[in-house]
From Swiss-Prot:
NCBIfam families named among the record's database cross-references: S21p (TIGR00030)
GO terms for cellular component: ribonucleoprotein complex; ribosome
Name this polypeptide is given: Small ribosomal subunit protein bS21
GO molecular function: structural constituent of ribosome
Region (Disordered), start-end ranges: 43-62
Species assigned in the record: Trichodesmium erythraeum (strain IMS101)
Length: 62
């Protein structure tokens, strides 16, 4: 869990920037987007197969 403690003379803007930086470093948004909707096992397999195809296509270029 990400948490930001406001300093004595710290503004809200700088604390918000720190919070956003911590959230992006923790990788919360991609995880949140991934779990937004339930993904059936078939959808998982399709997604992984598509990712594997993309990866193979990229590797074959070089």
């Amino acid at each position: 869990m990400t948490q930001v403690i406001l300093g004595e003379n710290e503004g809200i803007e700088s604390a918000l920037r720190r919070f956003k930086r911590q959230v992006s470093q923790a990788g919360i948004f991609p995880d949140m987007k991934k779990h937004r909707h339930f993904e059936t096992p078939i959808e998982k397999r399709k997604r992984k197969a598509m990712a594997l195809q993309k990866q193979r296509k990229r590797r074959s270029r070089y």
